[in-house]
Regions:
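Juxtamembrane intracellular "pre-TM" segments in multi-pass secondary transporters
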Residues: 2, 183-217
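Cytoplasmic helix-loop-helix junction between adjacent transmembrane helices
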Residues: 101-142
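Paired small-residue
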Residues: 81, 85, 96-105, 304-312
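Helix-breaking motifs and short loop linkers at transmembrane-helix boundaries and internal kinks
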Residues: 36-38, 70, 91-97, 108, ...
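Helix-to-loop junctions at the C-terminal end of transmembrane segments
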Residues: 59-70, 263-276, 362
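Conserved MFS/SLC helix-loop-helix module at the cytosolic interface between two early adjacent transmembrane helices
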Residues: 57-95
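C-terminal transmembrane helical hairpin of 12-TM major facilitator-type secondary transporters
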Residues: 277-324
């Protein structure tokens, strides 16, 4: 990549970082929101769902819109919407108002990752694409790992409203960066056609998802189930089994984000050595190591293996997901925005399913069962993926 291309990728990565952080920083703030808004703890988790559902479900929609109207133009609108929505959340006087603001924010944030991924595909050469997407997603998911710790600290020091303001300001900075993107090599938008519409979009999306490239999209779905499913339970695991309070647990989870950043920087080299399918294999091996370390942590009650597991989980995820994005761009080069959006859709819908299935596993056999089931599922994904994914 040239220095200008790297600048574009890092600018887009920062936008993705803010969009990912905007979801995950809320989790440690939930107890404070319960106290301030005087609501039951059992219902406040709807704040997370209110953001995550549109964030995942609308990624293919935003990707397809970007294909038609232009990616930079769309990014300027949706990043601005993310900033405004996050700042509005800080002013919410009640839980219904906060939920409404989170839904609105999630709708704007939904397109940032998928549109940015497709734009990176426009900016860099095919040879540099895997490395560029890896760097983009490494920066993006650093936000997921770091935001939980930062959100918890800000909430403890100055309150949850201040946390929303801080992340809203970061979104404004991201918007200013997008406004400076000019002449970055985006291909011309197709401008729409008479056949466009909801029915045509759904038909195209289903045809693409279950078409010849279905192995790529279905692997994204199972990746979400396993990696995000495991990640979602690590915070409660650290509290219940390792005895860590909220802030130390959040700080430990920041190693997930640091590993994402490191893995995103290394993914291009790994791809050069082993190919795209080999990069996915390395990521899956790292995920298996994370499951094994979490099992050790469960048996011993020590948080040290869990710290290494958080890093392995982040490294594994950032090697698998962006590589699937790169493979998806070849499924239909005329609709790269839709294809990258379908990857995001698969991952986040899978993450939601993983949370539900993980809860069943814990109810049936505790955290030991969760880690064992996750390892078995990932081993199965590895075997099937090695045979089914494109040999690149």
């Amino acid at each position: 990549m040239t220095s200008e291309q790297r600048r574009v990728v890092l600018t887009l990565g920062f936008c993705g970082l803010v969009s990912a952080a905007d979801n995950w920083f809320v989790s440690p703030a939930l107890p404070a929101i319960v106290r301030t808004l005087a609501v039951a703890p059992s219902v406040v988790a709807v704040i997370l769902t209110a953001y995550l559902v549109p964030y995942g479900a609308l990624q293919p929609v935003c990707g397809a819109i970007g294909d038609r109207v232009g990616r930079v133009r769309l990014l300027r609108v949706i990043v601005a919407g993310l900033a405004v929505g996050t700042l509005v959340c800080a002013l919410a006087p009640s839980l219904p108002a906060l939920v409404a603001a989170r839904i609105l924010t999630g709708c704007f944030a939904a397109g940032i990752i998928s549109v940015s991924q497709a734009l990176v595909g426009d900016v860099v050469s095919a040879e540099d694409r895997a490395a560029a997407v890896g760097l983009l997603m490494g920066v993006t998911f650093t936000g997921q790992g770091l935001s939980a710790g930062l959100g918890g600290i800000i909430t403890e020091l100055v309150g949850w409203r201040a946390a929303f303001v801080c992340f809203g300001v970061l979104a404004v900075v991201a918007w200013l960066g997008v406004m400076r993107l000019r002449g970055v090599g985006e291909r011309e938008a197709d401008g729409g056609s008479s056949s466009s519409g909801a029915g045509a979009f759904l038909s195209s999306a289903v045809r693409t998802f279950f078409g010849p490239g279905r192995a790529v999209f279905l692997t994204a779905f199972t990746t979400g189930i396993i990696y995000l499913g495991v990640y979602g339970f690590m915070g409660t695991f650290l509290a219940e089994r390792c005895g860590l309070s909220s802030t130390p647990a959040c700080l430990l989870m920041m190693f997930y984000g640091l590993a994402c950043l490191a893995g995103g920087s290394l993914s291009g080299r790994i791809g050069g050595w082993h190919g795209l399918r080999g990069t996915i294999l390395v990521g899956e091996a790292s995920g298996l190591a994370a499951a094994g370390l979490l099992l050790v942590s469960t048996v011993t009650g020590s948080w040290v293996p869990a710290l290494v597991a958080a890093a392995c989980l982040g490294l594994g995820y950032i090697l698998v997901q962006p590589t699937l994005v790169s493979l998806s761009m070849d499924v239909d080069p005329a609709q790269t925005g839709l294809c990258t959006g379908l990857i995001g859709f698969g991952v986040f819908v899978g993450g939601g399913a993983g949370s539900t299935l993980g809860g069943f596993a814990i109810s049936a056999g505790g955290y030991e069962a969760l880690w064992i089931v996750a390892a078995a599922a990932l081993a199965l994904q590895t075997v099937i993926g090695w045979r089914a994914l494109p040999q690149k």
